[in-house]
C-alpha cells in the first residue's frame, strides 16, 4: 500500500487533530503517502482531497476540533453516494482509508469495506459510546470541561443556597453524566441507561435539606430529558430555588487533555499499521490500556453499555 486517506466525520471531538497527526506521520515514516479528505464523507463525494505532508500536521496536537473539518452526509448512506466516494478514492490512487469519528462514521467505513475498499475506524466522539473500546478520543477532555463547570457552579450554588440542574451531552449514552457526576460529587445523576423515580429524587433532596444541606447538584444527560423541565419540576415540588445550566457544545471544544492526545496518537498509529498489514474492515480501541482491534461489523452489532458498578457507586456515595 503506497497511498492512504484520512477523514474525520460526524461530531467533532478534542484529540481528532492528534489522531490525524499520528496517521500522517506514521504513514510517512513507512514511506506511504497520505491524503486528507476535507469535510468528511461529503468532501469525499465532492473530491475535496489534498495530499498531506509532515509540516501540515505540525503544531496541531494541542488543538481542539479537526483541521480536516467535519460534516454530516446523508448522501453517503445511499449506494450511489458510496460509489461516488469510491470513485474519488480510486481517482486519487488511495488504497486504504482511516475514518475518525463515531458510530455513524463507522457505518460509512463498514459500507466502503463491503464494497471492497479497506477502511479502519478510529473512535472519535465525546460520548464514549463506541463498542470495542474503553475510551473514545475526546471523552476525557469533555469530562474535564464538565467537571470544571460543575466546580464553578457548586461555588455559586453554595453562596446562594440553590439547587442546580446541569444538563450534559449524551443522547443515548450516559458516560459523560455518570463520570462527571461521580467526580463532581453530584447528589443525583440521571442517565439514559437507567430508570429513575422523580418522587424518590424529590424525597432525597428534601431529606438532605432537613439535615442542613442547603445546595445540591443534579446532572442530567440530554437523552433523559430537558434539564429545564427537571429544574421546573424540582422547584415546584420542593420550593427550593433552582437554576438550570445547559452546557451544550462547549463540551466538544478545547485543547485535548494529555490522556486524549496520547490515546489519539496510539490509535491513529495502529490504524495505519492495520492498513499496511492488509487488514481492512477493522476498528481500533483501547481495553485495559492495551491497543486492540476488532471487526468493524461485529463492533457495530454490539451495544455500548455504561459501567453499572460506577452507577451503583454514584448512588451509594450520594446519600
From Swiss-Prot:
Gene Ontology BP term (one): fructose 6-phosphate metabolic process
Residues reported to bind ATP: 11, 72-73, 102-105
GO molecular function, one term: monosaccharide binding
Residues involved in substrate binding: 125-127, 162, 169-171, 222, 243, 249-252
Keyword rRNA processing: no
Pathway assigned in UniProt: Carbohydrate degradation; glycolysis; D-glyceraldehyde 3-phosphate and glycerone phosphate from D-glucose: step 3/4
Activity regulation note: Allosterically activated by ADP and other diphosphonucleosides, and allosterically inhibited by phosphoenolpyruvate.
GO CC annotation: 6-phosphofructokinase complex
Keywords: Allosteric enzyme, ATP-binding, Cytoplasm, Glycolysis, Kinase, Magnesium, Metal-binding, Nucleotide-binding, Transferase
Superkingdom of source: Bacteria
CDD domains xrefs: Bacterial_PFK
Cofactor(s) the protein requires to work: Mg(2+)
Homology family: Belongs to the phosphofructokinase type A (PFKA) family. ATP-dependent PFK group I subfamily. Prokaryotic clade 'B1' sub-subfamily.
Function: Catalyzes the phosphorylation of D-fructose 6-phosphate to fructose 1,6-bisphosphate by ATP, the first committing step of glycolysis.
Record protein name field: ATP-dependent 6-phosphofructokinase
Organism, scientific name: Geobacillus kaustophilus (strain HTA426)
Gene field: pfkA
Amino acid at each position: 500500500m503506497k497511498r492512504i486517506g484520512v477523514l474525520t466525520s460526524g461530531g467533532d471531538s478534542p484529540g481528532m487533530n492528534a489522531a490525524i497527526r499520528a496517521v500522517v506521520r506514521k504513514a510517512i515514516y513507512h514511506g506511504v503517502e497520505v491524503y486528507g479528505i476535507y469535510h468528511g464523507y461529503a468532501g469525499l463525494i465532492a473530491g475535496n482531497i489534498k495530499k498531506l505532508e509532515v509540516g501540515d500536521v505540525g503544531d496541531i496536537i494541542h488543538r481542539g476540533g479537526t483541521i480536516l473539518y467535519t460534516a454530516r452526509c446523508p448522501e453517503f448512506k445511499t449506494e450511489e453516494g458510496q460509489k461516488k466516494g469510491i470513485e474519488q478514492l480510486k481517482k486519487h490512487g488511495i488504497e486504504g482509508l482511516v475514518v475518525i469519528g463515531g458510530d455513524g462514521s463507522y457505518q460509512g467505513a463498514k459500507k466502503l469495506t463491503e464494497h471492497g475498499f479497506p477502511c479502519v475506524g478510529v473512535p472519535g466522539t465525546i460520548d464514549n459510546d463506541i463498542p470495542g473500546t474503553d475510551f473514545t478520543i475526546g471523552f476525557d477532555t469533555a469530562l474535564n470541561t464538565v467537571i470544571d463547570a460543575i466546580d464553578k457552579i457548586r461555588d455559586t450554588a453554595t453562596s446562594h443556597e440553590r439547587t442546580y440542574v446541569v444538563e450534559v451531552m449524551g443522547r443515548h449514552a450516559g458516560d459523560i453524566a455518570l463520570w462527571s457526576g461521580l467526580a463532581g460529587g453530584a447528589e443525583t445523576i440521571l442517565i439514559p441507561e437507567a430508570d429513575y423515580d422523580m418522587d424518590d429524587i424529590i424525597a432525597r433532596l428534601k431529606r438532605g435539606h432537613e439535615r442542613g444541606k442547603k445546595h445540591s447538584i443534579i446532572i442530567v444527560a440530554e437523552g433523559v430529558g430537558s434539564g429545564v423541565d427537571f429544574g421546573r419540576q424540582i422547584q415546584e415540588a420542593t420550593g427550593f430555588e433552582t437554576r438550570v445550566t445547559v452546557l451544550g457544545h462547549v463540551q466538544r471544544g478545547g485543547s485535548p487533555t494529555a490522556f486524549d492526545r496520547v490515546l489519539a496518537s496510539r490509535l491513529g498509529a495502529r490504524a495505519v499499521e492495520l492498513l499496511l498489514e492488509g487488514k481492512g474492515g477493522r476498528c481500533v480501541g483501547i481495553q485495559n490500556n492495551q491497543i486492540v482491534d476488532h471487526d468493524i461489523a461485529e463492533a457495530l452489532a454490539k451495544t455500548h453499555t455504561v459501567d453499572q458498578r460506577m452507577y451503583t457507586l454514584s448512588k451509594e456515595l450520594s446519600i
